[in-house]
Amino acid sequence: QLQVLVLDEADRMLDLGFSKELDEVFSALPRKRQTLLFSATFSEVIRQMAGNLLRDPLSVEVTPRNAAAKSVKQWLVTVDKKRKSELLLHLLQTQNWGQGQLLVFVKTRKGVDQLEQDLQRAGVSVDAIHGDKPQPTRLRALERFKAGEVQILVATDVAARGLDIHDLPLVVNFDLPIVAEDYVHRIGRTGRAGATGLALSLVCADEVNQLAAIEALIRQTLTRHDEAGFEPDHRVPLTDASGQVP
């Protein structure tokens, strides 16, 4: 009886390992149907899925494939891994961010909890969401952030997927994502609906391969900045949009 199939966040489903389950769903579908597939990025895997699932599809692109929104200013600060929390607190005190809210992405649940504790000890208004927190707790944290009751929300990629926060001025990548496409998803939380936004990444030497992959994906070299007093002991090699690491 199914007439319309809608696949939203298709790339994330594949990233999370649901390829087999999707194939099982597809095999049970009637041939005569309408299929709508939405994805913030368009990898080769997504292209293959679309080719197998869709017949004579109409493609609608709101931005170039895998491109970051032009309304978002992107830059990075190089820093040693062990000083990232200290650097973030320093930037909160010295940058002209005012009382604007920040969405901070961390790659692990343990890392989310640790950064939340570091910020709380420094007197910063912060909440956190990740997959180990009960759904009611995550929803409450999100509602508090949307209401402006906390300045910073720390989150993992999965927990923050699909967040729609009005007028969010700044996204911080405390850790670079393992999957380059997630960078586009992350910074897409800001600079929405014609507004401008900022996206800052704190990058250590261990993340140079991830940085190169991100720059190759978005086809641009991110502007670098060394913060005085936080110059890394372990240099982050120069990268560019070619994706090559020296």
Stretch-by-stretch model annotation:
Residues Q1-T239:
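Conserved helicase RecA-like core
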